[in-house]
């Protein structure tokens, strides 16, 4: 597993606006901290509203938003198959959005 990998998520029933159901997630944890039993993941959504801090990327031919404001530490048991990897501009847009939501700009 590497930073930028897109994996299937097995999420529990969420509360309120927490993500749930079948979706993908982007590994945003540093490669220096992998592998671990818990990994930082940004979930994705094809139906989330547009926002300046939600980068839109292509995953398996479908445009999807990376919900960087909902990054979570997930046990690796909640991670399914590796389906893709974000490279170049797509990963840069995730990094830039993470900087914005974490106040690192």
Where are the regions that the model predicts?
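Conserved functional hotspots at enzyme active or ligand-binding sites that engage polyanionic ligands
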Residues: 1-105
């Amino acid at each position: 597993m590497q930073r930028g990998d897109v994996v299937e998520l097995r999420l529990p029933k969420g509360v309120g606006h927490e993500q749930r159901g079948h979706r993908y997630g982007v590994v945003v944890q540093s490669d220096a901290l992998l592998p671990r039993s818990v990994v930082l993941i940004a979930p994705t959504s094809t139906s989330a509203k547009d926002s300046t801090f939600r980068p839109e990327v292509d995953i398996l031919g479908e445009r999807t938003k990376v919900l960087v404001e909902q990054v979570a530490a997930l046990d690796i048991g909640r991670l399914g198959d590796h389906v893709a990897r974000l490279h170049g501009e797509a990963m840069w847009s995730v990094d830039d959005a993470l900087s914005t939501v974490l106040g690192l700009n």
